[in-house]
């Protein structure tokens, strides 16, 4: 395995193009806008009789999911297939990692299969960065979610959803509600919203589920739902992540719903044309009532559709960036 050149930005090639997609932290607005524009152009592919374009023909994308997922894994598979790539999905529950093999050894074996791209989802923060730092330089790494750290493609599909329904970020008020402390989606959304120029980003939740120092992301903190939702354009609800919680952070799910669950009455605090989003899976009656999740303000299913296009954009752009870097290195080696 060959460590990446320490002088080269990990996510970008020497021309500033995407070569890995690990986090939204530090990526310029122009690149995020390019991802959104590229995803927009891919949306029509899903409406075709033959839902394929040949951009990744002959390439192999390996989905390495160490955490369970339905939407993320399926949409990455569909995205790669629609780009005409060959797709391998590793079933971690039956893989050697469940028998004691380390992440490093698993990576070495996958690399020996000559995959061109890894999509990695892992419970440990930083796992995708670790792989990108040690993988062969010709292989692109996409973060499908790592611990509490980042979920960059979810962040970008949320941005595409907002842009398609609201047009611009410049005058928006966006509220992110719920379990902020354990949410990699919240972090990615905050970074993307700030980079794209959203002037009013709010986080709402109980004090025990809001991380200390979150104001550094340029957000306003609210512990009262009605106050935080006042006149917002976008409401992003988050799932309570019981699997990541230590005891004592919440009295009960019922108490959380009583104070922070999104109901029709509470949504009335937002603007009349506000949209409601959720990364899924939804816990009905815990963070959101069914009347809201299935109602006229909800764009939750649109998020799933847009997720395929965003992941097509990221896969194609990262592969293009890898190819450009390879050509650049070859020319400069002569």
Swiss-Prot record:
Carbamoyl phosphate binds at residues 71-72, 121, 151, 154, 280-281. Belongs to the aspartate/ornithine carbamoyltransferase superfamily. ATCase family. One of its GO terms (cellular component) is cytosol. HAMAP family: Asp_carb_tr. Catalyzes the condensation of carbamoyl phosphate and aspartate to form carbamoyl aspartate and inorganic phosphate, the committed step in the de novo pyrimidine nucleotide biosynthesis pathway. It comes from Pseudomonas putida (Arthrobacter siderocapsulatus). Its EC number is 2.1.3.2. It comes from the Bacteria. L-aspartate binds at residues 99, 184, 239. One of its GO terms (molecular function) is aspartate carbamoyltransferase activity. GO terms for biological process: 'de novo' pyrimidine nucleobase biosynthetic process; 'de novo' UMP biosynthetic process; amino acid metabolic process. This is Aspartate carbamoyltransferase catalytic subunit. Heterododecamer (2C3:3R2) of six catalytic PyrB chains organized as two trimers (C3), and six regulatory PyrI chains organized as three dimers (R2). Pathway: Pyrimidine metabolism; UMP biosynthesis via de novo pathway; (S)-dihydroorotate from bicarbonate: step 2/3. It holds the Pfam family OTCace_N. Keywords: Pyrimidine biosynthesis, Transferase. It catalyses: carbamoyl phosphate + L-aspartate = N-carbamoyl-L-aspartate + phosphate + H(+).
